[in-house]
């Protein structure tokens, strides 16, 4: 999301909160439930240049959200119960699920104690390569390159581009421009570009992020608690829609099989890496259904409605991220009013509204 879009969304959410529209309309717009999405839960203060801080929330904010959800009358449930709750939405209280992508060690160290304190079930989605200790955290490697460099040169869109990196602001602007260009490239090519930049600046991608994610042994130990569910997140964290059908299926199937083998229990839940429309679509939703998972989640923004019982491999989530660490925004989103307004706009614009 661009800075301008982020600012506009914050303004809209604040308006929903302060006008009282959320409280007034929630009974009609709230829907059946919500699946929250997180990545890092980290108490460290933000750095001057830290573009991936959007993936981080503080433990204090997470705990505030958990309390807000409970106080608002939501039941916090495991993903295993989502279908049943959607099918009986009219007779049930609203529900919330908490999910965390990638299997970062801070999930265990900082998020787990909070969920344990409130007896709140949660799911961690794990790319099997990450748990094996050989994951490619290219977005973090790229951040590390820009932090170390004073300038870089790249061939982008067929022309040579020079980026000055003298200040945090210059580094931040360069990161966002280049990041979205990389996201448009084929997966292998994008990762090769970052690997070449890392080599040119004497950065070892494998060593740069050692210790960031949990090993299989750590995941097994964590999963001994019945509050914890471990789901699959592909092998190598690829944008599946960019892959051929056979490759995409293998990424999904082998990660599901690996989670089952390592934990000794069925793997019933899946998360699409990146999860946006360009990264996961109808083909991937169909593959997930064919592979037998009970739920598969995207990063598409939205709440859950009874109709989602028929789209269990294309479920939206509500992101808890570093740009929106404010309970006003969470309350506004939980009301469902922003999504009702978005759907109204889509209807007038001729687009297909969300369920």
Please place each PLM-identified region on the residue numbering.
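Conserved beta-strand->loop/alpha-helix structural units within folded catalytic cores of enzymes
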Residues: 101-108, 118-123
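A short acidic, amphipathic alpha-helical/loop segment
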Residues: 110-114, 218, 283-287
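Metal-dependent polysaccharide deacetylase catalytic core of the NodB/CE4 family, i.e.
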Residues: 36, 41-42, 93-96, 116-278, ...
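Short, well-structured alpha-helical interface segments that form or flank functional binding sites
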Residues: 64, 106, 110, 214-217
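C-terminal active-site subregion of NodB/CE4 polysaccharide deacetylases
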Residues: 2-99, 106, 137-146, 153-154, ...
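A broadly conserved amphipathic alpha-helix scaffold signal in soluble, globular proteins
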Residues: 67, 109-116, 195
């Amino acid at each position: 999301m661009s800075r301008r879009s982020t600012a506009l969304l914050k303004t809209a959410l604040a308006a929903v909160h302060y006008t009282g529209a959320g409280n007034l309309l929630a009974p009609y717009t709230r829907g059946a439930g919500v699946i929250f999405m997180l990545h890092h839960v980290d108490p460290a203060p933000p750095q001057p240049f830290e573009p991936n801080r959007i993936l981080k929330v503080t433990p204090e904010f997470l705990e505030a959200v958990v309390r807000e959800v409970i106080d608002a009358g939501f039941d916090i449930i495991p993903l295993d119960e989502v279908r049943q709750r959607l099918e009986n939405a009219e007779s049930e209280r609203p529900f919330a699920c908490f999910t965390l992508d990638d299997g970062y060690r801070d999930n265990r160290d900082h998020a787990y104690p909070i969920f344990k304190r409130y007896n709140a079930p949660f799911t961690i989605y794990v790319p099997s390569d990450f748990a094996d200790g050989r994951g490619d955290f290219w977005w973090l490697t790229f951040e590390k390159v820009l932090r170390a460099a004073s300038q870089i040169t790249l061939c982008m869109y067929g022309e040579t581009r020079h980026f000055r990196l003298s200040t945090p602001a210059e580094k931040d602007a360069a990161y966002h421009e280049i990041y979205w260009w990389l996201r448009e490239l084929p997966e292998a090519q994008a990762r090769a570009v970052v690997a070449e930049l890392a080599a040119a600046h004497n950065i070892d991608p494998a060593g740069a992020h050692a210790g960031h994610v949990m090993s299989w042994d750590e995941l097994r130990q964590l999963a001994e608690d019945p509050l914890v569910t471990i789901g699959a997140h592909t092998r190598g964290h690829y944008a599946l829609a960019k892959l051929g059908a056979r490759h995409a299926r293998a990424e999904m199937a082998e990660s599901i099989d690996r989670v089952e083998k390592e934990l000794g229990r069925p793997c019933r839940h899946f998360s699409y890496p990146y999860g946006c429309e360009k990264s996961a679509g109808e083909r991937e939703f169909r593959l997930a259904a064919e592979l037998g998972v009970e739920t598969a989640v995207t990063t598409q923004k939205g709440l859950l409605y009874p109709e989602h019982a028929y789209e269990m491999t294309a479920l939206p989530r509500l992101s808890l991220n570093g740009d929106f660490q404010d309970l006003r925004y969470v309350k506004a989103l939980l009301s469902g009013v922003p999504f009702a307004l978005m759907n109204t706009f889509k209807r007038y614009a001729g687009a297909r509204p969300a369920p």
